[in-house]
């Protein structure tokens, strides 16, 4: 007899990984739209929390030392050279008045929040949960 109770089947499609990839696509598209505008529309602003030690994160060593696990940046009024690609985004932000270039892979992002519309996303903290080879459909 087959066990058809919830959770008894093996997920060969990997829906959880597909969902994580789709949610990262929402983040990517939101950032890409703002980078094309070269300014934040309306009252929108973003809080982006990311894992500072994850492979591919590029930022000043003193910031990694100050934030050894996670860091939250605010993208609102003062940012420069904001560029978004398929797998990461780059931005210049000022820390204590000094411009700092940052490159952050989407896989390193753990939380995204736009308080102007009370919209937020939380991603798996385990990067291995992100699907490798799962195609991401971009507009």
Regions of interest found by a model, annotated:
Residues 1-86:
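N-terminal leader/targeting segments and the first structural element of proteins
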Residues 45, 49, 53, 93, ...:
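Charge-rich, low-complexity amphipathic helices
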Residues 121-139:
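Intrinsically disordered, low-complexity terminal tails
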Residues 15, 45-46, 79, 112-114, ...:
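Aromatic-enriched hydrophobic runs in primary sequence
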Residues 61-124:
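Compact, basic/aliphatic-enriched, mixed alpha/beta core segments that act as assembly/interaction modules
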């Amino acid at each position: 007899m087959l066990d058809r109770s919830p959770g008894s089947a093996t997920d060969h499609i990997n829906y959880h990984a597909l969902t994580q990839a789709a949610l990262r696509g929402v983040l990517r598209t939101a950032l890409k739209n703002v980078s094309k505008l070269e300014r934040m529309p309306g009252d929108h602003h973003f809080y982006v929390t990311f894992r500072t030690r994850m492979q591919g994160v590029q930022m000043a060593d003193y910031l990694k030392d100050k934030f050894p696990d996670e860091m939250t940046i605010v993208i609102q009024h003062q940012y420069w050279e904001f560029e978004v690609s398929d797998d990461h985004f780059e931005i210049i932000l000022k820390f204590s008045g000094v411009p700092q270039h940052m490159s952050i892979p989407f896989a390193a992002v753990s939380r995204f929040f736009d308080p102007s519309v009370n919209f937020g996303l939380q991603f798996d903290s385990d990067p291995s949960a992100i699907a490798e080879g799962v195609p991401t459909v971009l507009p």
